[in-house]
Amino acid sequence: MSNPAVIARLREELRGIEGGSFRRREALPFGIGAIDGVLASTGLRLDALHEVAGASAGMGDDAAATLFMAGIAARAWGPVLWVVRRRDLFAPGLAQVGLAATRVIYAEAQDDADLLAIMEEGLRHRSLGAVIGEAKRAGLAATRRLQLAAEGGRTIALLLKRHASAGGDPLGAPSAAVTRWRIATAPSTPLPVAGVGRSRWRVELVRQKGGAPGAWDLEACDETGRCAVPAGMVRRAAAGSGASRAA
C-alpha cells in the first residue's frame, strides 16, 4: 500500500517543474562501441525499465551498482527522482560521477510497495529525466507496471535490486525490465607511482530483450558520468586488430 502523504508531497514538488521543454532521445549510448554495439537499441532505451544489482551483498559492489546508475542519470537530461528505503546515499559521491545535488529530488518510502508506487508516479510525470529506486522485492507484475509507466512517460527507470538477507540472486526472478545488469568492483587502474588509481568495475549485461548478454571490464564513471575502457585494453585490442589485418 502506497503512502498517500508521500505521493501528495511528490505531486506538489513535481508541479513546480511542469512545463519544461526537453528534447527526448530514444536511447542513451554509453559511448563505448563494445557495449553500444551489443545493446539492441545501440544504448539504453530512455522509455524503459533497467535493473541493476551488485555482484554481492558487500558494500563495495553495492556502491558500484549505485554509482553506475547515478552515472546513467547524470547523462540524461533534467531532474532525477531518487526513491530510497534507507538513508545511506552519499550526495558528494553522486556528484563525483556527474549527478549534481541540485538535480536530485529525494523521496523516502516505507516499504518496497510504497517505493514502487512512488516510482510509478514519477515516471508518468514526463518532466523528469530519470527515476531511480532501490528494492529487494519487485515481482513481474510490479516491474511490468514500471515498464508501462516508463513507456507512457518516456522516462528511463533504474531499479537497484538489493540482495535479500536470505541470499539468492536479486536478478533471478522474472522481470519486465528491458535490460538487467550486474556490477562488481575490480582492482583499480595501476599508477606509475604509489597511490590509488581510477576505480574499475566488472559490468555484466545479464539479460536484455532482443539482444545478447555481455560483460566488460571498465573504468568507473568519471565526473561526466561516463565509463571508459582501460587504456591497456584499448592498446591490446588495437594491436590484435593490426595483427589480424596483417595476417
Language-model-detected regions and their locations in the chain:
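Flexible, glycine-rich phosphate/dinucleotide-binding loops
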Residues: 58, 89, 113, 166, ...
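Arginine/glycine-rich "motif VI" loop of SF2 helicases in the C-terminal RecA-like domain
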Residues: 148-155, 196, 210
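Detector for small/aliphatic-rich hydrophobic stretches
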Residues: 1-82, 101, 207-211, 217, ...
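Conserved nucleotide-cofactor-binding alpha/beta core module
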Residues: 77-144, 148-153, 162-163
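Solvent-exposed alpha-helices and their adjacent loops that cap or buttress functional pockets
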Residues: 44-45, 123-125, 151, 173, ...
